[in-house]
Amino acid sequence: MSVETQKETLGFQTEVKQLLHLMIHSLYSNKEIFLRELISNASDAVDKLRFEALAKPELLEDGAELKIRVSFDKDAKTVTLEDNGIGMNRDDVITHLGTIAKSGTADFMKNLSGDQKKDSHLIGQFGVGFYSAFIVADKVDVYSRRAGTAASEGVHWSSKGEGEFEVATIDKPERGTRIVLHLKSGEEEFADGWRLRNIIKKYSDHIALPIELPKEVAAAEGEEKPEVEWETVNRASALWTRPRTEVKDEEYQEFYKHIAHDFENPLSWSHNKVEGKLEYSSLLYVPARAPFDLYQREAPKGLKLYVQRVFVMDQAESFLPLYLRFIKGVVDSNDLSLNVSREILQKDPIIDSMKSALTKRVLDMLEKLAKNEPEQYKGFWKNFGQVMKEGPAEDFANKEKIAGLLRFASTNGTDGEQIVGLAEYLARAKEGQDKIYYLTGETYAQVKNSPHLEVFRKKGIEVLLLTDRIDEWLMSYLSEFDGKTFVDVARGDLDLGNLDSEEDKKAAEEVAKSKEGLVERLKTALGDSVAEVRVSHRLTDSPAILAIGEQDLGLQMRQILEASGQKVPDSKPIFEFNPSHPLIEKLDNEASEDRFSDLSHILFDQAALAAGDSLKDPAAYVSRLNKLLVELSA
């Protein structure tokens, strides 16, 4: 080893100290994952070199054959992993091995479940896989040199995984990174060729470059140990380039875990090769659970992009719409240029064609999952339903297909679970029903007891109950499904069409005519608080209700605008009353205009509360109510 210069001792960032403590003391039940993580990092380093060497072939120096080597020394109790990838300079080493993004650490800690097996798989997802070395090692040495720098600019990083690390400059003729793990007492099992071989086959068989181990050759008695011969122990071919019939489910699952840094198997996957005008292969996965940053718009998303099997970029966002940002996978194109950039991807017509086809493939995969595995789809919807609801606004071409994948709670259920699809809703619709009825609100408890549903309960008509914040916005982009229009049961003048008999309609007209005087009195009493007063066809049990104007914003949208600091357009509700309710009959017979006004305002405020709205003047409501209670108790 060359002489070390510019040696300095630095302290780990606080977050790294916490992480190291966690690695060493908490994740000991699944120790072998250290090798999976280090191989995954080495594979990324080789991918980066391949990509940078497209523009600068000299980076390959004299070693064009890219590989990872794993070796061990039983006597010294060490395991060594070496790659000839991009390598690191001094700054890289300090940055990557001494600090990690604070947000990443916080999220990592927050996501720990206490289940050691699950937690051990989280480490790759948060970019902290290197530190898993300390699960089995009490000291780690890293020797690295970045491709394109002088041999004298190598760097040696060393740490015992406690509070600090040492960095020194060394001579390192070969580019890339060598990691030496000094195994803890009791971890000698890993200094064994068969053990390492089995771990590599188990976790890293899909890695698309050779992972080599020394051949197990026993020296004859009295002979010198033969020179080390290396042999490739993984399959070392890009999984997506192989015929589907040759790839086992277990291989697809392990590959998913590698690219997604997930510990669970995916729910579903689609492996496809397109030939003809466009030529590309794709392997797309639906995860079983949502990533921690699903709702952070700036979070990394997109597919791994390869061009003619050469890695080009992670998180290529242009191949799928934003509402499918949870999909993981790779796309390998023969038609794109190797020097393609993110900017070019956004403008290339080839990408538009690929995006359209890949989007359809994902939606087909989800349709198949919903049809064949309804329980699994239920789990998918819990994790990704709100993101899927962004689809109709973003993807007009596939609006009907996306609508078929949506799931809602309904009046047929009892617990608010979103399990009703639109096709299922229509399949059990009443004879003559030509509309899909829905109601939006803040909570399931609030909407399921809403007075707006009274006439629907009486007639046995199912209503979809929409309580996600995004729902009212979603419905502004969904006008119909399978030829049936959507109707908000709280909006406008409710018309049940064929579901109301001619006798019902005639009787309603007669009642409305007989209550014209009461309508006028209520208009006068409520004044500017309402846009209109009318007899209700919605109510059977409640005295009054507030309906929304046909063009007005509902409560959900108003709250979203208010929360984002935007101006909310002025609107007034429609006050509807139930002519057969005893309170309304009493109100109609009230001679005192002052008392009539008080009762009218109490009914108006109660209707607002039932709709989930807040009162503009709670003190006035309480005062009127107290006054009424005093009169009643006198």
Curated annotation (Swiss-Prot):
Residues 343-559 are annotated as: B. Coiled coil: none annotated. One of its GO terms (cellular component) is cytoplasm. The keyword Cytoplasm applies. Residues 1-342 are annotated as: A. Its main location: cytoplasm. InterPro entries: HATPase_C_sf (IPR036890), Heat_shock_protein_90_CS (IPR019805), HSP90_C (IPR037196), Hsp90_fam (IPR001404), Hsp90_N (IPR020575), Ribosomal_Su5_D2-typ_SF (IPR020568). Homodimer. HAMAP family: HSP90. NCBIfam families: PRK05218.1. This is Chaperone protein HtpG. The gene is htpG.
